[in-house]
């Protein structure tokens, strides 16, 4: 399946899931900004290469270190429930490979992301840069990798 078709299918699955849960989430559909972000950010770029054929399936995928990238519906739902406004800043604990941070950077003014596992944080930095979320230099005495994504830019410590 081509990426465009897989992404469109993923969006349809997310929309159907939101509609199915409309009573629980209090609305018939997720915020269009979140759906746009989900369609814009290439999920296959945030999973290990051997799992890229499954990137748009509505399943969590292993990313190493006994961690997973959440299934697309959960990423969309969590992001929607944050009700992010254009001037909001968001803190993410646990960067993983950067997918959630890339999604959050679409509706938010700034995203702070703290990597729990340094190796994943370094991989996330590279993947986010490839998506145009380049770092803004920042000093930090923290042993953890921290990034700030700001409308197309990111800050790492």
Positions of predicted regions on the chain:
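Conserved nucleotide-cofactor-binding alpha/beta core module
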Residues: 81-157
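Residue-level detector of alpha-helical recognition elements and their boundaries
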Residues: 25, 52-53, 93, 119
